[in-house]
């Protein structure tokens, strides 16, 4: 199935110069959504035993929860500040113009557990790398990453921790 045909390209959103990838049509298409989850799952076969899927707010929740269900794993959300009740672990990371932060329930993961980090798009890799740092703070281990789309021109996969497999369903070369 051609998943690209189910991704709507929206120019100049959320600001001028950005070509936004809207996955709403993909989510509305039962066969397309199922194919996306199956293709994400196919990339996890070489990642070893996994205990949880960690989904990054917000579209990583949609894909991550569906993928967790498909793989028979639990789901753990990583959220923006102030969305989770305490205690939480926090990780600050750099953006192009400033900083942002992500949070994880302090007791959601335990030492020795292995997780798959999932998001819809990897652009610069900052959000995924910060999520990996949160997982490390918890004592758990990142077994792999899975993304529906990689914006290759931003080199985000190079920002991920070395030696950890990353699976991408679709690679976009241009902005």
From Swiss-Prot:
GO cellular component, one term: cytoplasm
Compartments, as annotated in UniProt: Cytoplasm
Chain ranges passing through the membrane: none
GO biological process: adenine salvage; AMP salvage; purine ribonucleoside salvage
Principal location listed in the UniProt entry: cytoplasm
Catalysis performed (reactions): AMP + diphosphate = 5-phospho-alpha-D-ribose 1-diphosphate + adenine
Role noted for this protein: Catalyzes a salvage reaction resulting in the formation of AMP, that is energically less costly than de novo synthesis.
Protein name: Adenine phosphoribosyltransferase
Species name: Synechococcus sp. (strain JA-2-3B'a(2-13)) (Cyanobacteria bacterium Yellowstone B-Prime)
């Amino acid at each position: 199935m051609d998943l690209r045909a189910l991704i709507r390209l929206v120019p100049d959103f959320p600001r001028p110069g950005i070509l936004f990838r809207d996955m709403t049509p993909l989510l509305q298409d039962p066969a397309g959504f199922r194919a996306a989850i199956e293709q994400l799952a196919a990339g996890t076969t070489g990642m070893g035993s996994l205990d949880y899927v960690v989904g990054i707010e917000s579209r990583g929740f949609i894909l991550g929860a569906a993928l967790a269900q498909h793989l028979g794993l639990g789901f753990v959300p990583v959220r923006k500040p102030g969305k989770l009740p305490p205690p939480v672990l926090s990780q600050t990371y750099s953006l192009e113009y400033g900083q942002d932060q992500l949070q994880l329930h302090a007791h959601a993961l335990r030492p020795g557990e292995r997780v798959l980090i999932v998001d819809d798009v990897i652009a610069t890799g900052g959000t995924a790398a910060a999520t990996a740092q949160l997982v490390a703070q918890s004592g758990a281990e990142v077994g792999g990453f899975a993304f529906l789309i990689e914006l290759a021109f931003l080199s985000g996969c190079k920002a991920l921790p070395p030696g950890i497999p990353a699976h991408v369903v679709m690679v976009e070369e241009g902005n």
